[in-house]
C-alpha cells in the first residue's frame, strides 16, 4: 500500500481498507450508490476535497467478489485483491472510469503501470484498453 499511496499522492498517506462479504457489500452499494447489487470495491475519497489530507480515504472490498473474479480471470485471489486495491486507490485519487471513455482509458493505463511495478505485468492483456 505504501508504494501505491506514494505513487498516486506523492508523499506519505494512509487509507483504510475494510474487507467484507457480498451481502454487506450489496447493502453498502445500495446505500452509497443506489445500486442493489454487490460490487468488488467501493471508495470514499477525502483527498479530492482536501489535497493536504494525510488520510486519503476508505476502501471496502468484497472478498466474495474478489474470489469470483479471480476464478473468472484465471489467477489467484491474492492477485485479484492487489488489483482491487490498485483500482480502489486510483478512485481515491479522483479517477473514475464511469465518467468518460477518456478517463476509463487513463485509469486503466495507470492501473497497468502500477500493477507492473508491483510485479504483476500484463494482467489487462486479456482486457484490451478502450
Spans of features found by a protein language model:
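An acidic/histidine-cluster motif and surrounding catalytic segment
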Residues: 1-82, 89-130
Amino acid at each position: 500500500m505504501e508504494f501505491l499511496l506514494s505513487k498516486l499522492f506523492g508523499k506519505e498517506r494512509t487509507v483504510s481498507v475494510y474487507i467484507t462479504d457480498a451481502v454487506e457489500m450489496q447493502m453498502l452499494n445500495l446505500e452509497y450508490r443506489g445500486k442493489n447489487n454487490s460490487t468488488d470495491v467501493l471508495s470514499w475519497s477525502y483527498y479530492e476535497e482536501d489535497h493536504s489530507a494525510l488520510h486519503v480515504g476508505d476502501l471496502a472490498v468484497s472478498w466474495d467478489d474478489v474470489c469470483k473474479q479471480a476464478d473468472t480471470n484465471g489467477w489467484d485471489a491474492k492477485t485479484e485483491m492487489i488489483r482491487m486495491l490498485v483500482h480502489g486507490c486510483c478512485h481515491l485519487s479522483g479517477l473514475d472510469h464511469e465518467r468518460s471513455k477518456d478517463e476509463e482509458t487513463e485509469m486503466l493505463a495507470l492501473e497497468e503501470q502500477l500493477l507492473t511495478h508491483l510485479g504483476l505485468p500484463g494482467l489487462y492483456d486479456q482486457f484490451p484498453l478502450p
